[in-house]
């Protein structure tokens, strides 16, 4: 069974007034989509873990701990980290932590929660 870590932004800490985000987006919508994605991945035979980052976090030592505590085959970095300008530094930090603590894991990007499994299949 392939082990995958999904890294995303904690929806409870997102500033939904940010004009980069869709106007109707809410934390409930993100949470529902994330749960559905993880359930789909688990049903497809992946062992998935979720790691959420609070907006504005600069200390990613907990992420480093997660990556050293379990050997992951792949790490998915969600579009909420990559695609929102305010999270750009966080994105760089995440990539460097993954590169340092999970050297053998494939780094995977999705464009939407609904294409996460397709994104994983490209690499695993």
Predicted regions and their residues:
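Short, well-ordered secondary-structure micro-motifs
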Residues: 16-18, 61, 120
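Short catalytic helix/loop segments, enriched in acidic residues and glycine
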Residues: 22-39
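N-terminal, charge-rich interaction modules
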Residues: 1-20
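Short beta->alpha junction loops
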Residues: 49-58, 110-113
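Mid-chain, well-packed structural core segment of small domains
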Residues: 61-97
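Ser/Thr/Gly-rich flexible loops in soluble cytosolic domains mediating phosphotransfer, phosphorylation
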Residues: 33, 90-124
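A generic structural motif
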Residues: 42-48
